[in-house]
Amino acid sequence: MSSTTKVSSAVMQTYNRFPITATKGKGSFLWDDNGEKYLDYTSGIATCNLGHVPDNVQHAISNQLKDLWHCSNLYHIPSQEKLAALLTEYSCLDQVFFCNSGAEANEAAIKIAKKYAKDKGYDDRTEIITFEQSFHGRTGSTMAATAQEKIHQGFTPLTEGFRYLPFNNKESLSEIDNGKTSAVLLEVIQGEGGIHTAEKDWLKQLAAICKQADILLMIDEIQTGIGRTGSLFAYQPYGIEPDVITVAKGLGSGFPIGAMLAKQHIAASFSPGTHGSTFGGNPVAAAAGIATLKEILSDGFLENCKEGQEELFNQLKSIKEISPLIKDIRGKGYLMGIEVMNQASAWIEKLREKQILVLPAGEKVVRILPPLTTTKEELQICIQALKEVALELGGNTNG
């Protein structure tokens, strides 16, 4: 350590960390180093979709650790092949590139869009369109793809090749097919940007424009995928077929893994040497992904989540009706946002004092991300705490 520098932690301070030191997790709960128990409705930022340390995933990881941890992608990996087969069977895509995170998955999508355009002879198609208030990562290219000025501050000049359009704006759709666009990248529900859901007519029109012009439609499912919004992938209820999707977070139930899925004719642009990942789709990560998907795809699992998801939405609406501090309730499934009139941080702090963990989605939105395995009793604990916080912060919860 430098003799002129004194720091309290050797970890770089890239996060404004909450005053909790997590030591254990199980199901919907997290414990700190003092033994305090918290209802964790952050799910590791939409990652622990099966709750903390799910038994089946733990067993799959433990069993794989006995045989092989890592061998690189120079060799065939059976668990990787099996996971890819599952992902393609239950989506409209054909082939998978594995990596370690959401940002890496989106980087892969950006690269394949550029390569596909070159392979097709679309030399003038040098732009990828993304949308205002999007979030696609913090690497060089994914930060540039993220249409939020606060994410860009201090990192200019940004990577070139991205153009931003307003989200859910039908008038701006005419700007997509301008001869320069290789791909459109978007979230069906903008998570970090404030829980904004794509309107069905808008997204279907966008998809039709892309299909007619051979512009790649790429859906970022990092936060919305793996059952988070009620279907395996958030794009599926819209009746569209993206050319590329990206997944991570919930895919490994907290074990690091990411993936970029593409149609076969697009995947062909990634020939040997064009892209790679040392650890991507390693045997342990793939085992975690297989176990996760098997649970979520099991008979009745997603259907059984619907009652709790509807209950959460209805209860949040009822709190809004009696609290002048709540402006709107947004989201789908177990990806919900409460837009408040004051600062979201005030709600988050009050809830933490009541042993409930939630997240911000911007300055004015409280983000609630229960695990898909949460119970009715746990949901009621959260709802009751929200009612109490609304009252404490000035809401009229007496009707």
Swiss-Prot record:
Reactions it catalyzes: N(2)-acetyl-L-ornithine + 2-oxoglutarate = N-acetyl-L-glutamate 5-semialdehyde + L-glutamate
Residues annotated to bind pyridoxal 5'-phosphate: 102-103, 135, 220-223, 278
N6-(pyridoxal phosphate)lysine: modified positions: 249
GO cellular component: cytoplasm
Recorded GO MF terms: identical protein binding; N2-acetyl-L-ornithine:2-oxoglutarate 5-aminotransferase activity; pyridoxal phosphate binding
An example Gene Ontology biological process: L-arginine biosynthetic process
Cofactor(s) the record lists: pyridoxal 5'-phosphate
Binding positions (N(2)-acetyl-L-ornithine): 138, 277
Pathway: Amino-acid biosynthesis; L-arginine biosynthesis; N(2)-acetyl-L-ornithine from L-glutamate: step 4/4
Keyword terms of this UniProt record: Amino-acid biosynthesis, Aminotransferase, Arginine biosynthesis, Cytoplasm, Pyridoxal phosphate, Transferase
Cofactor note: Binds 1 pyridoxal phosphate per subunit.
Protein's cellular compartments: Cytoplasm
Entry EC number(s): 2.6.1.11
Superkingdom of origin organism: Bacteria
HAMAP family assigned to the protein according to its UniProt record, in alphabetical order: ArgD_aminotrans_3 (MF_01107)
Subunit record text: Homodimer.
Note: May also have succinyldiaminopimelate aminotransferase activity, thus carrying out the corresponding step in lysine biosynthesis.
UniProt family annotation: Belongs to the class-III pyridoxal-phosphate-dependent aminotransferase family. ArgD subfamily.
Protein name: Acetylornithine aminotransferase
Species: Oceanobacillus iheyensis (strain DSM 14371 / CIP 107618 / JCM 11309 / KCTC 3954 / HTE831)
Organismal lineage: Bacteria, Bacillati, Bacillota, Bacilli, Bacillales
Gene encoding the protein: argD
